[in-house]
Amino acid sequence: MRVLAIDPGTVRLGLALSDPSGTIAQPLSVLARRSEAEDLETLRALVERHEIGQIVIGLPRTMEGRLEAAALHAQAFGSKVEQATGRPVAYWDERLTTVAAERYLIDQGKRRSKRRQEVDRMAATLLLQGYLDYQRGRGPGG
């Protein structure tokens, strides 16, 4: 079963996709946010095209593990994604995924302008791989 990860932001949605076995995460794309209705329709079409069985949404927690405004927005968005796609939505702790993605892209020699374009989908990929590893019993989780 393929899993789609969404790293939600106010300007962009980072997207990552698992392989068909649900083992390996790979970057998919970055969706520039428009209206909520357009975003949900785009996600619905992606779910159908890639035969997604599960969706994982990054849940931004504070370093102390608390849920604040951004996390509540992510949960509200997740409920709408679940309704629009008909697929179950899980939430996964996304603390430090953007920092790790940025470091990875710097290590790869990506210029700042290119990093801005890629960091959201790389963060979604790290988020998804953490979720997949946890589901397989291989890693710590959220």
Model-derived segments and spans:
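Phosphate- and other anionic-substrate recognition elements at nucleic-acid/protein interfaces
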Residues: 1-6, 10-142
